Amino acid sequence: LLEDRGVLKVGQNLKYDMLVLKRYGVRLTPLDDTMLMSYALDGGKGGHGMDDLAQRHLGHTCISFKQVIAHAPGKKAADKSFAGVPIDKAAEYAAEDADVTLRLWMILKARLVAEHMVTVYETLERRLVPVIVDMEHAGIRVERSVLARLSATFAQRAAEYEDTVYELAGKQFNLGSPRQLGELLFDDLKLPGGKKTKSGQWETRANLLDDLAANPDLPEDARRLIETMLQWRQLTKLRSTYTDALPGHIHPDTGRIHTSYSLAATTTGRLASTDPNLQNIPIRTKEGREIRTAFIAEKGNKLISADYSQIELRVLAHMADIPQLRQAFDDGL
């Protein structure tokens, strides 16, 4: 039935269900996904989860997962599991899920036809689902040893930067504390350009520190302190976000990272990657490019990188027919 091409399967965020079924060799087809139908129709109008859609189109408040899981045994939320939810409560939750999905499908399907969006949904959004399922299932291979080596290197360099900051500051303080850094720069050293937040704390955002370091009237030691502080921040961020965090996402059975791609999270049609986000691995810095070397192909294969250059602006230039913008692209600017 699940693979019968003569029977349409309707669901909400079917990518999740398809991934589970794929592990058991089942290929769900054909399908309609109410989340993607809503996204094709109302891409910039808020969330496309079932709770949001049920409220928006049906005026209905769905049973929340928190409510149903509360029926499971265990004193703390961390101790509770859906497997422990009584059958009658689980059945009510699942039945509502199916009922709401079908009612949403009838509303959204009619809108797709009325608003001439069937082609966009069927040829762009829906066709991408099985592709994304295969991508998530396959994952990407990551070399633990590369991440471990980079983590150690970054830690050593960060420690050196820390010592330099202490020397230039004339005292030790918590480099990870924006409050202590702000007090050092603007209270102790009396540097210009300081701004305070509503809570009365000095701002120490990276762009503010960049502007401060670019001040030609700044004493050289103060400039070096700020620049070294920014380098320390960069390295500690790379360690905590990538070299130390990514190994925890490597699946013990596959040895690969299986990120989750959302097809309905952006207003521009781009995918969003979470758990972990593999779309924001740095590339403009030397350290970022080193982190990228940890992502490797299986033996006998190669990784290929392909990207459109300024695709959104190019589409805008074409659709809006802006001569100056089109000329800028023609001139390679």
Model-derived regions, located:
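Conserved RNase H-like, two-metal-ion catalytic cores of nucleic-acid enzymes
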Residues: 1-57, 139, 155, 284, ...
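Solvent-exposed alpha-helices and their adjacent loops that cap or buttress functional pockets
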Residues: 2, 295-296
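Short, contiguous acidic/charged loop-to-helix segments that flank catalytic cores in large enzymes
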Residues: 41, 249, 325-329
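Structural motif
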Residues: 8, 302-303
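Short C-terminal domain-edge/linker segments immediately following a structured domain
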Residues: 39-43, 61-62, 290-293, 333
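Conserved "right-hand" nucleotidyltransferase catalytic core of DNA-directed polymerases
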Residues: 14, 27-29, 45, 53, ...
